[in-house]
């Protein structure tokens, strides 16, 4: 990712409309490949991944506080979706470790969103964790439309499978 692209992204995140709400409204330029929708939450491919298969999980409601914006029940419902989507992702994309974190800021990208990022096997330790998610050190992974469509289709198919039974692992 070039410095210009990062600067453009940061400007849009800080001064533009909510990207999640715009996506939900169908605003051109805010389209994402949705892989899960239960009516209250969505999961979709990250448009700017550093790792293959990186997803975002969001509540449909515009909530800005990742803890205080939820009741305990609504927070746990969102986390069930995070778990369900991450489990499906681990079945589709080979991973050594699944990163799950909430980013965003009161200064930009305010809509609560959880990042689910599969670290592939064999990445040296020094290139893991936050380094693996950093555009400035890792760059942005470029997928063709065909590759992104194929990945989204595989994830949708996995998410349509019956729920995991007790004790079954990813």
Locate predicted features:
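HIT superfamily nucleotide-processing domains
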Residues: 1-170
């Amino acid at each position: 990712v070039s410095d210009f692209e990062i600067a453009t992204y940061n400007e849009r995140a800080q001064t533009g409309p909510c990207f999640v709400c715009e996506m939900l409204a169908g605003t051109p330029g805010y389209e994402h490949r949705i892989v899960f929708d239960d009516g209250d939450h969505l999961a979709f491919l990250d448009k700017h991944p550093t790792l293959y298969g990186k997803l975002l999980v969001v509540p449909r409601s515009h909530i800005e506080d990742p803890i205080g914006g939820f009741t305990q029940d609504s927070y746990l419902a969102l986390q069930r979706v995070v778990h369900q989507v991450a489990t499906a992702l681990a079945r589709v994309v080979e991973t050594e470790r699944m990163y799950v974190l909430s980013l965003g800021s009161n200064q930009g990208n305010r809509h609560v969103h959880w990042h689910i990022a599969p670290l592939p096997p064999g990445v040296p330790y020094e290139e893991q964790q936050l380094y693996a998610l950093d555009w400035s050190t890792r760059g942005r992974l470029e997928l063709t439309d065909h590759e992104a469509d194929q990945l989204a289709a595989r994830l949708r198919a996995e998410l349509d499978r019956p729920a995991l039974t007790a004790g079954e692992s990813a």
